[in-house]
Amino acid sequence: MHDIRAIRENPAAFDAALARRGDSALSSQVLELDEARRAKILAAETAQADQNKAAKAIGAAKAKGDEAEFERLRAEVADKKAEVAAMQAEAKELDAKLTDMLARIPNSPAEDVPDGADEDDNVEVKRWGDVPAFDFDPKEHFEIAGVAKAMDFETAAKISGSRFVVLKGAVARIHRALAQFMVDTHVDENGLTEVNSPVLVRDEAMYGTDKLPKFGEDSYQTTNGWWLVPTSEVPLTYSVAGDVIDEAALPIRYTAHTLCFRSEAGSAGKDTSGMLRQHQFEKVEMVSIVHPETSDEEQKRMLGCAEGILEKLGIPYRTVVLCTGDMGFGARRTYDIEAWVPGQNTYREISSVSTTGDFQARRMNARFKPADGGKPEFLHTLNGSGLAVGRCLIAVLENGQQADGSVKLPDALAPYLGGKLTLTAEGQLA
C-alpha cells in the first residue's frame, strides 16, 4: 500500500515509478479522489460544528422561555444531524474507494532495480557450480528409470486431475528428506525460528500480504471463505499485523515448511509434463520482519541462505535480479535463484527472495516502537523461498542421474536417508 502523503508531496515521482513498471500514470486519479474525500470530511466537520453550536443554543433559548427560538433550533439540530450523517457516509465511501485504488497499485521499484519489460531483461549477478557433463543424453526427472514408477501422475490425475503428482517409495522419502534438510539448515545454521503455521487463512491475511484484491483468481478459496495459502509468506508475515513491536525485538526471522496451493491461472500449456508446475506443492519459506534501515542488508542475507541450500546439495545455479517489468506486484526488489535442470538444458527458478519495504506493513498496520521513544514507524517485510521442495527434488534427480538409470544423491542428505545415497534404477535406496 502506498503512502498517500508521499503521493501528495511528489506525484511526479509516484508516476515515474509506475512508468518504470510499464504502467500508466495514476497520481491525478488518486489525488482527485483524495481531494474529494478530504473535502467531504471537512464539510462533515463543519456541519458537525454547526450542529454543536445550535445544540448549545437550545439550552439558552429554553432558559429564556423563547419557545419559537427553541423549536427553530431543535429543527436545525435535527437537520444538521442528518446532514452530518450523510456527509460522513459519503466520506466513508470515498475513503473506501481510495483505499481500493491504492490497494491495486503495485509497489515502487528500488532505484537500483534494472529497468526492463520482461524476463529477458533480468540481469544475472552470480553463477555457481559447474554444469554436469554427461556422456549420454540426460533425461527429464520423470523419465529417469529409478524415478518413473515412483512419480505417479496417472494416479494423481485419477484422484485430483491435472497438475498433481503422487510420490511413492524412495522418491517420496527423498522429497521429505530435502524439506527436513532445508528447515534444519535454516534453524541450526541460519538462525531462523521454525513455525508450524495454518494453511487456511482469512481475507485479511491475503489482503495484508498483497495477494488480494488483484490476485484472487490465482488462489483457492473454500466455501466458508478461507483461502488455501499460495505460500506460507502469508501466515508468517501476517502474524505481526496490527502489532507495535519493540525495536529491540527486531529482526524477527521465521521459516516454515508447508503445503502451498495455486490455481496457475494463465499458465495453460506451460510445463504440462512433470513436477515443475503443480496446483499443490511444498515449500520451505523464509520471512524476515526488520527495521527499515536494515532491510536491504537483510535481503542479501536471505539470498545467501537460499543459495547456501543449493551449494550444500551441489546443485549448479545462477542468481538474477528481476527487472522492473518482471517483478511481482508487492516487490520493491527481487532476486530469483535458478537451478540447473539438465533434462531441459536450462536454468529454472527455484527461489525468489523479495523485499517489499513498508508496502505490506502499511496494509497490515504493522509497526515498531523506536528505542528512543519516538513515534511508531512501519516495519519492513521480506520473504523468500528456501527452497521450493518439488523443484529442488527435480534438480537433485536430474543433476545426479547416471547412464544406467540410477541417481547419485547429495552427501548432505545422508543423515536423512540412513546413509544411503544411491537411488537405484529399480527405485530403491542403496
From Swiss-Prot:
L-serine binds at residues 231-233, 285, 385. SUPFAM superfamilies: Class II aaRS and biotin synthetases, tRNA-binding arm. ATP binds at residues 262-264, 349-352. It is an enzyme of class 6 (ligase). Pathway: Aminoacyl-tRNA biosynthesis; selenocysteinyl-tRNA(Sec) biosynthesis; L-seryl-tRNA(Sec) from L-serine and tRNA(Sec): step 1/1. It catalyses: tRNA(Ser) + L-serine + ATP = L-seryl-tRNA(Ser) + AMP + diphosphate + H(+); tRNA(Sec) + L-serine + ATP = L-seryl-tRNA(Sec) + AMP + diphosphate + H(+). Catalyzes the attachment of serine to tRNA(Ser). Is also able to aminoacylate tRNA(Sec) with serine, to form the misacylated tRNA L-seryl-tRNA(Sec), which will be further converted into selenocysteinyl-tRNA(Sec). This is Serine--tRNA ligase. It comes from Ruegeria sp. (strain TM1040). The lineage of its organism: Bacteria, Pseudomonadati, Pseudomonadota, Alphaproteobacteria, Rhodobacterales. The gene is serS.
